[in-house]
């Protein structure tokens, strides 16, 4: 991890964060606005595979993490849709799959630079109950921290994780002060499938009762850690009569709006969910009620 100030793009920050998190490999297929993550990772000399499509990339990550590697992918829009197949399998098998998503506007190919239109897909895409962690950074400094945290939480709690960003954040070049971020300890990876014996690790169940038991167990585990994982940022909510709820790069604009409105004697505050899944509902209810 660098120990001083750097002038970096969001792409460079992601690559740096993944390296510092101990990631060993990346599987991906180029798609705007995340192409530079793949090329940046490849240029760093780390192991990578540009696959034939996002379906192959996702299952490549699944295989890598089962073998004990910290691995990840990056995609957007239509590619993100294809990745939900492998990502929901990772949810079912409790694999520490990390995915960086640079959101696109939809439907389908839509726009390529900005959007908040992949929130539902990131939180609940694929068939399943949405038992995954979704982080929404609002600055390039936070992009670094939350990418590091995505790896740590995924490997510690054994749920897949998404860092949900966009083209504005990824293409922004700004100063990131690594001294202010401080030291972040890594949760080590470990081999999930032993080499010395044959293991059958099911990702499909024959009977409805069997599937029900597995889903309920995973949901219980997810709910147990939700309070530890969920994060929020609040700004001037103590006396707020109007509460703005925003996340990601939009929350950065909301902060400027609040400053302007406060100068006009309007009591406006910001509630920013840093994690969209698990969503910090209890904190929002408390803040919105004014208690």
Q: Where are the predicted features?
A:
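Glycine-/acidic-rich phosphate or pyrophosphate-binding loops and their flanking alpha/beta elements
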Residues: 7-14, 219-242, 255, 259
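Short helix/loop capping segments that flank catalytic or ligand/cofactor-binding pockets
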Residues: 83, 172-174, 253-255
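Short, solvent-exposed amphipathic alpha-helical segments in soluble enzyme
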Residues: 42-44, 88-91, 116, 148-153, ...
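Glycine-rich beta-alpha junction loops
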Residues: 104-106, 165-172, 248-250
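Redox- and metal-dependent alpha/beta enzyme cores, enriched for Fe-S-associated oxidoreductases
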Residues: 231, 237-266, 271, 277-284
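Conformationally flexible catalytic loops at phosphate/diphosphate-handling active centers
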Residues: 45-46, 158-234
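Thiamine diphosphate
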Residues: 1-125, 130-131, 139
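Conserved thiamine diphosphate
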Residues: 113-167
């Amino acid at each position: 991890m660098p120990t001083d100030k750097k002038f970096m793009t969001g792409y460079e920050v992601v690559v740096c964060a993944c390296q510092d998190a101990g990631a060993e490999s990346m599987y991906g297929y180029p798609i705007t606005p995340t192409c530079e993550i793949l090329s940046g990772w490849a240029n760093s000399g780390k192991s990578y595979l540009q696959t034939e499509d996002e379906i192959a990339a996702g299952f490549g990550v699944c295989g890598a993490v089962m073998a004990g590697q910290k691995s990840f992918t990056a995609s957007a829009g239509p590619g993100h849709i294809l990745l939900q197949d492998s990502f929901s399998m990772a949810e079912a098998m409790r694999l520490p799959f990390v995915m960086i998503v640079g959101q696109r506007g939809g439907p389908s190919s839509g726009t390529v630079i900005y959007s908040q239109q992949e929130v539902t897909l990131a939180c609940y895409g694929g068939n399943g109950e949405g038992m995954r962690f979704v982080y929404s950074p609002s600055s390039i400094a936070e992009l670094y921290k939350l990418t590091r945290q995505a790896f740590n939480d995924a490997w510690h709690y054994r749920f897949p994780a998404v860092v949900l960003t966009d083209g504005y954040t990824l293409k922004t070049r700004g100063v990131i002060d690594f001294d202010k971020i401080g030291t972040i300890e890594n949760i080590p990876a470990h081999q999930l499938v032993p080499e010395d014996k044959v293991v059958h690790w099911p990702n499909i169940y024959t009977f409805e009762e069997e599937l029900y038991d597995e889903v309920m167990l995973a949901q219980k585990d997810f709910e147990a850690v939700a309070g530890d994982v969920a994060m929020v940022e609040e700004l001037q909510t103590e006396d707020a009569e109007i509460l703005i709820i925003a996340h990601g790069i939009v929350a950065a604009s909301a902060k400027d709006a609040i400053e302007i409105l406060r100068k006009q004697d309007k009591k406006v505050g910001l509630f920013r969910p840093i994690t969209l899944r698990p969503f910090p509902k209890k904190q929002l209810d408390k803040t919105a009620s004014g208690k």
